[in-house]
Design a protein with these regions (language model features):
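Short, low-complexity N-terminal intrinsically disordered segments enriched in polar/charged residues
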Residues: 22-56, 64
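Surface-exposed, charged secondary-structure patches
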Residues: 86-164
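Sec-dependent bacterial lipoprotein signal peptides
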Residues: 1-22
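A structural detector for beta-sheet-dominated domains
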Residues: 73-75, 127-131, 178, 189
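A short gly/proline-enriched turn/hairpin at secondary-structure junctions
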Residues: 72-94
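Short, well-ordered alpha-helical segments enriched in acidic and aromatic residues
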Residues: 58-76
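Short beta-strand edge/turn micro-motifs at domain boundaries
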Residues: 23-35, 136-195
Length: 195
């Protein structure tokens, strides 16, 4: 009887140790907030969500920020370097659309460079220096009367922990933001930086 009680106690003790070993108090369960609703109720909130999409490397958040007819535009000095032939006429274009931008950004977030030179970074930091609201502009183009144009200095840092290295870029991005319903979207992202 004593042996049976000892065996039962020993089995219960081992079972409780086994169950306890599955929980690590120094590594609590991660909470995924990426499914939180993205409201973009103001231009500032939209740009904060853009920083969040980069920080979390979340392509779904990123896509929710772009207008369906979104365009990424390059300055003319960059066209020969990074422009792509969007309309298949054999000439590099100074812009690309929603689908191409989502593909490029998904590669950045999750797969690395398309040429295989760079893996996906371990951390991405996009810091936008949003000017005060009184420095925002309205778009003078006909039909864009309710659009807001915000020129932001930015810093983008890609960090690679395994090689203890990082790539950094900075410059000016001009965002053309368009309201639709009670939300704001990026209609045009014009990169005004020199590479």
């Amino acid at each position: 009887m004593i042996t049976r009680n000892r065996t039962s106690v020993l089995v219960l003790l081992l079972l409780s140790l086994l169950l306890q070993s599955c929980w690590n108090p120094f590594r609590p369960r991660m909470i995924d907030n990426s499914n939180d609703l993205i409201h973009n109720r103001t231009p500032l909130e939209l740009l904060q969500n853009l920083e969040r999409a980069y920080r979390e490397r979340n392509i779904n958040i990123y896509k929710s920020l772009l207008a369906p007819d979104f365009r990424f535009e390059l300055i003319s000095s960059e066209v020969n370097l990074i422009g792509i032939d969007v309309n298949e006429d054999g000439i590099r274009d100074s812009w690309w659309g929603f689908d191409e931008d989502v593909e490029f950004t998904d590669n950045l977030f999750n797969h690395g460079s398309t040429d295989g030179v760079y893996p996906s970074p371990d951390q991405i930091t996009l810091r936008l220096m949003v000017p005060p609201e009184e420095n925002w502009e309205t778009d003078p183009e006909l039909g864009h009367e309710d659009w807001i144009v915000i020129a932001c200095n930015f810093d983008l840092t890609l960090t690679y922990l395994s090689s203890n290295s990082s790539l950094a870029a900075g410059g000016v991005a001009r965002f053309y933001l368009r309201p639709s319903g009670n939300r704001w979207y990026i209609a045009i992202w014009r990169d005004e930086s020199n590479l």
